[in-house]
A protein has these predicted regions:
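Class I Rossmann-like S-adenosyl-L-methionine
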Residues: 1-200
Length: 200
């Protein structure tokens, strides 16, 4: 029987593959799900981690750059993606305790590198955890385009376009709304399958 995949490790491989090939995210995601056995809970976590990290990458990289003593574009790819995934979980998800996120990321960093990369990962992520809820993005008063773009992970050109169209308040609301994960509701046709069988 095939061993169940680790959703975080699989997410690192997915993001690394995307960077190297430039393939479409949905196709890569579907392929990895087909090739790697995941429970429904782990599949949901894997999907959320990959989509969320891609969506919030600009914000995540700003946070990482604030705490990394090395330029993040000089880090080995898998170490960087492992850090990005962990920062996404710490900053934007609350289903897994921060200590567990850090612990898992450190284990993966050791597997992908060595004790030095594990210690580096641990140090960076502990600083991220300490800053949660009070991390300072670029000041709105200094540059509203940069503030909204970095904080909400949008390119400056689209923020400028929205500001011209809607003004500052509505643009910020739009940025927030665009980053909300839509709720998923599943209706089961019990004539074809039971809810219990569907959840397997």
């Amino acid at each position: 029987m095939k061993r169940t995949a680790n959703p975080r490790e699989l997410a690192v491989h997915t993001l690394t593959g995307l960077e190297q090939t430039g393939d479409f995210l949905r196709e890569v995601l579907d392929l990895h799900i087909q090739q790697n056995p995941l429970s429904p809970v782990d599949r949901a976590l894997y999907t959320e981690l990959v989509y969320g990290t891609v969506r919030m990458r600009r914000s995540i990289d700003y946070v990482l750059s604030s705490f990394s003593r090395r330029p993040i574009n000089k880090l080995p790819e898998r170490i960087l993606h492992n850090l990005r995934l962990a920062v996404y979980q710490i900053m934007y998800l609350d289903r897994v305790p921060n200590y567990a996120v850090v612990n898992e990321a450190v284990k993966l960093a050791r597997r992908f590198g060595h004790q030095g990369t594990a210690s580096f990962t641990n140090g960076v992520l502990r600083q991220v955890v300490r800053s949660k809820g009070r991390f300072e993005f670029p000041a709105k008063e200094d540059n509203i385009v940069e503030h909204l773009g970095v904080k909400h992970s949008f390119p400056n050109w689209i923020v400028e376009h929205w500001l011209d169209m809607f003004g500052a308040e509505e643009t910020e609301q739009l940025c927030q709304a665009m980053n909300k994960t839509p709720e998923l509701h599943v209706r089961v046709n019990t004539l074809r399958i039971s809810a219990e069988d569907l959840s397997r």
